[in-house]
Amino acid sequence: MDSFNNLIVVTLALGGVATGNGFNVLHHLAGNSPWFSGPEVTGISSEVPAECTVDMAAFISRHGSRYADNGAYREWANLSSRIHAANFTVQDRALDFLPSWKPVMEYPEQQIAQLSTTGYKELYDMGATYRLQYPDLYAYNTNFTLWSNYYYPSSRVRDSARLFARGYLGPNATELGSIFALNASNPRSFMNSLGSSDLCPAYDDDEGGHHHETWKHIFLPPIQARLNKLIHGDFQFTGDEVYIIPYLCGFETQIMGSSSPWCSIFTEEEILQYEYAQDLRYWYGNGLGTQIEKYMMLPVLDGLVQRFVDGPEATYTTSDTSTFVPPKLIAAFTNDGQISQLAAAIGVFDEETPLPATEISKNRLFKASNFVTMRGTIGFERLHCASEKAGNGTYLRIRLNDVVYPVAKCQSGPGKSCPLAEYQGLVKSKLNSAGNFSQICNVKDPAIPAGQNSATFFTDIALPFQTLVKP
């Protein structure tokens, strides 16, 4: 599997991206990194434990690599305008490109916020990889159902599901595949979509708030001063412009398919400081450092775990009384905010110490770069272990960008997996702690159903707020 997942890294790890000591800038940009298979930080083998089999699997993934959105492109264009209006020279070869730099998007009106060519590749590869990794979970040339957030601002999430389906199903994907795109803004979808926070008025992702800003004010000024000493004339970087340099590195590299010159500007230490800023952004924006934001994907997790508890052969009666047999591989696509919310819910970071805002927490397990990348993926495997040695029973294990992470408070099973029934209990306990979602969200809209605390869309494909999309 690693050969598939590392192909894009090999393609992109060109001059200025991977250094002589093996440090790869693209592995430290959090949500601005193209896909890569995560580092082995837990010491747990990704191989299926002896005498166990995977009889069900699931993943919830961010969309693939994309072009800049409107806000980011405006920042790029404004920076380019300032550069070209100035008269200056540079004193470092790493900045030689600067006087002539312009944004790499050739057709911004059409490309804004859409998947890039690297995104296409990531998703096709992902489909083929999952087909090879779990050959027993799909019968050749049969129908396959998957899900996506509809996400009205852009088609990139739906397109990610479409491209995955083509890689997974092959030439007959359009005939065999059915993608149910969930409209997270429809009141009837409250806590029953892949964008649960959309209908929560109290939800407020402040992008890390004062923790994020405190760290930016510590680490950015020295970088700004260092760079501006290398520029002579009437151009100087602002602090905000310095902060988007790693963003430009990640985006330009995957858009062009070759190393961006922006990747050579920050030192290794400075990149790690930027990476920590991104950790603060997610931890305190919509992760475990928040009050209600961390709960938003719990209903989806609860519905997914119930599907695992019901087992691979379960059938369901949908809301229109038809019968639905879900796939043994549950595939779903959404956005980075939901990946961060889900990471807060799954239990692998529950014993992490809150991240300080004034210094880097060097021994932290939580690194957004390892799972909120483009095509960042939180995966689940249901392990059926048939022998006493393997611990007779059914277990669950979690994989972030391929790497197995143990549940902090439940790792008694083979390969530090968690007994499935115990994991369901843990999720139910989290739901109880969260309370009534209508109340914590301060819902006032009478069209929003009360008491909806668990997602049903994985087992009901007749819901009124979903749209069928074909690959």
Each predicted region: which residue ranges?
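Fungal secretory targeting signals
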Residues: 1-22
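Signature for phosphate-centric chemistry
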Residues: 19-147, 152-330, 334-471
